[in-house]
């Protein structure tokens, strides 16, 4: 396994774990404290977070198949950035009530 493959597997596993934790947090701790519309936004954030974390596992597999392919690595970093920017902004939106 290459270092890049190992890196993306690690990032994907951490992202997947965080998505599950945040999904459970929204379903149990936030449910009574936020509006149904905000809960829907939270669920959207979790759904995109999970899908992109799964995509990072695919990127890790592709990095293993094509170890020197810069485009695959770029796709992985863009997916990771998408989790932080898109899902992260939705999480912040719900928590801050903006």
Segments from the language model and where they lie:
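Polytopic transmembrane helical bundles with strong interfacial aromatic enrichment
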Residues: 1-98
């Amino acid at each position: 396994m290459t270092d890049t493959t190992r890196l993306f597997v690690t990032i994907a596993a951490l992202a997947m774990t965080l998505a599950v934790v945040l999904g459970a947090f929204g379903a149990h701790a936030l449910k009574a404290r936020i509006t149904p519309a905000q809960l829907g936004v939270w669920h959207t954030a979790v759904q995109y977070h999970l899908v992109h974390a799964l995509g990072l596992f695919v990127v890790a597999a592709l990095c293993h198949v094509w170890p020197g392919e810069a485009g695959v690595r770029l796709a992985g970093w863009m997916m990771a950035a998408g989790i932080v920017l898109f899902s992260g902004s939705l999480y912040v939106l719900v928590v801050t009530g903006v």
